[in-house]
């Protein structure tokens, strides 16, 4: 074979190798293929460990994480016995690792390309929410952290690929429950009752709207915004306001009032922000479905916290080191005074991934990931 032919063969092999290398690199960055990248914002419902790195009393100490799979006695950073909804979603869609907590020292470099979790237990939409707990990371500060992530990604892979990665990613925003819950004193002190919260909820949602637009301006396009769960069904609310089995209707009406306003706002954002899709994840409907049909889902207890200290429903004290823990965690809906068990989280995740318009409007996460 002539030297000219040898050079041609070498060039062909080199070009093919380069194409394969480039394709593999793009797949690993989430720029090619079916596995989306997730950036997650919110409160204790989706926190996976950020609060372990800050000065706050809102830390999910053991027995939180008792079934997570780490060495016994090691906190998982989650307010549950095991995995939470965002973990199930990540696994189902093929992510090799859960999106890492932003404040973990190992969340740097290529880890940022596979998704990051900025959520902080006790936080809310308003900067003042959760301040009594010590330091919490408000939604505004979570998005500031995301902006730093964005700059690091641009430095790592260049602005063109960064824009593509960020536009194709899914942004889960699961916050507002603590803002709704902290509205109870205002409602109780007003002769107008629920009507007195109209302006407060407008203020909360105006702040949320501003933060969602910031994310859009930073390159986000696919949003999943989780609404307020049925607050009146939590063991804490039952113990403090009712003492009886069954949900507290007035607290649930608060959540419903907030959720109606949120849904309208998300529809307006999708209409007015070019190329955006704001999905309303109806956490209220998902948890209501579990509570109303708990026997069909295989649960035995829908009223009490599995991890408990005191209270008719175990709802007075958070899950802490002195707590008692139920033996069969799969039979309980509620893990602690506010949060769900791993089994219940798995059902919520299934609704978010594949649920119809009763739970996800206008589409579920699986469909959003392919648009």
Where do the protein language model's features map onto the residues?
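Conserved active-site regions of diverse hydrolases
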Residues: 2-371
């Amino acid at each position: 074979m002539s030297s000219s032919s040898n050079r041609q063969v070498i060039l062909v092999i080199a070009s093919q190798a380069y194409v394969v290398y480039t394709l593999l690199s793009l797949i690993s960055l989430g720029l090619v293929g079916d596995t989306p990248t997730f950036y997650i914002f919110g409160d204790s419902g989706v926190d996976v460990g950020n609060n372990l790195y800050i000065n706050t009393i809102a830390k999910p100490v053991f027995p939180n994480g008792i079934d997570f799979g780490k060495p016994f006695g090691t906190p998982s950073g989650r307010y549950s016995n095991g995995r939470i909804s965002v973990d199930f979603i990540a696994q189902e869609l093929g992510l090799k690792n859960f999106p890492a907590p932003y404040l973990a020292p190992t969340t740097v470099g290529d880890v940022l390309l596979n998704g990051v979790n900025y959520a902080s237990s006790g936080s809310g939409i308003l900067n003042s929410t959760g301040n009594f707990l010590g330091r919490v990371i408000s939604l505004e500060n979570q998005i500031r952290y995301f902006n730093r992530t964005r700059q690091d990604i641009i430095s790592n892979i260049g602005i063109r690929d960064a824009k593509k990665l960020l536009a194709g990613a899914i942004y889960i925003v699961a916050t507002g429950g603590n803002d709704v819950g902290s509205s109870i004193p205002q409602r109780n002190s007003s002769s107008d009752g629920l009507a007195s919260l109209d302006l407060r909820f407008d203020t909360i949602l105006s702040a949320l709207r501003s933060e969602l637009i910031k994310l859009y301006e930073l390159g986000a396009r696919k949003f999943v915004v989780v609404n307020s769960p049925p607050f009146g069904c939590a063991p804490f609310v039952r113990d403090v306001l009712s003492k009886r089995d069954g949900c507290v209707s007035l607290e649930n009406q608060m959540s419903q009032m907030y959720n109606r306003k949120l849904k309208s706002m998300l529809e307006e954002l999708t209409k007015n922000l070019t190329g955006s899709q704001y999905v309303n994840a109806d956490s209220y409907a998902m948890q209501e479905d579990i509570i109303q049909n708990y026997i069909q889902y295989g649960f035995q207890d829908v009223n009490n916290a599995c991890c408990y200290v005191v209270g008719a429903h175990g709802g007075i004290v958070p899950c802490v080191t002195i707590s008692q823990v139920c033996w069969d965690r799969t039979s309980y809906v509620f893990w602690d005074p506010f949060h769900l068990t791993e089994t219940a989280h798995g059902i919520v995740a299934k609704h978010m991934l594949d649920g119809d318009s009763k739970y996800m409007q206008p589409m579920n996460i699986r469909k959003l990931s392919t648009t």
